[in-house]
Amino acid sequence: GIDFSKFASYKTAIGTVDGKNYNVPFDSGVTALFIRTDVIGEAGYSIDDFTDITWSKFIELGEDVLAKTGKPLLSAQAGGPDLLIAILRSAGDSMFDEDGNPNFAGNDVVAEAVEDYETMVDKGILVEVNDWDQYIGTINNGTVASVINGCWITSTIQAQEDQSGDWGVTTMPRLDNAPNATNYSNNGGAGWMVMNDSPNKALAIDFLMNTFASSTELYDTI
């Protein structure tokens, strides 16, 4: 069998129903602030200035970086929930309650997150784009000086070889007033499932048991 205790509990919980696990966790979506150290350096800052800070401080720094370099700190897909979800999760909150119902009315954490987002847009610190390709473009072409997303975004950053050595990574900002605010969050991460009517069900289960469910060497390699 598979020893699910070897995985982070939040990864196994999402695939567990009535005490039975239905998936093998794959990657995590640990969220961080990836930032162009060359750009913030031009504005007189280092990565330490952006470490373990609040969103109000991030906005303050963002205004100064924009004024001195002409570069906004962030971009986001207009209407996309990724950044807001990451902010809410950093404070242990969500857009939905445990029953899947909207969790907006009377939710001070949601209100604060939305207010910070709107402030960044209004001040030009965050640039909204139309689609995912444009979002990736703002990172690769140097339109923005940082990105807040799951750790899987590193493949996008590393693909731009001419920016090698220009990026650093640190904690994301935290909400100023939320009681459970932290500088840590998660966005994304996947899992593997075998369909019950798969013609190669036994083979697929055996494959998962001997690869993603047990081999730390495989994870280190990929």
Each predicted region: which residue ranges?
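Extracytoplasmic "Venus flytrap"/periplasmic binding protein-like
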Residues: G1-F7, G41-G44, T143-S146, Q160-D162, ...
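Hinge/lid segment of periplasmic solute-binding proteins
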Residues: G1-A32, I59, G168-M172
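Beta->alpha turn/N-cap motifs
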Residues: G80, W132, N149-T154, G188-A190
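Extracytoplasmic/periplasmic substrate-recognition and gating elements
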Residues: A43, K123-I125, Q160-I222
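Alpha-to-beta junction loops
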Residues: G70-K71, N141-G150
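Glycine-centered hinge/linker elements that transmit conformational signals in sensory
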Residues: I59-D64, G100-V129, M172
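Short helix-initiation/N-cap motifs at beta->coil->alpha
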Residues: D52-I59, V127-N141
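Short glycine- and hydrophobic/aromatic-rich loop-to-beta-strand nucleating segment
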Residues: T31-I35, L88, W192-V194
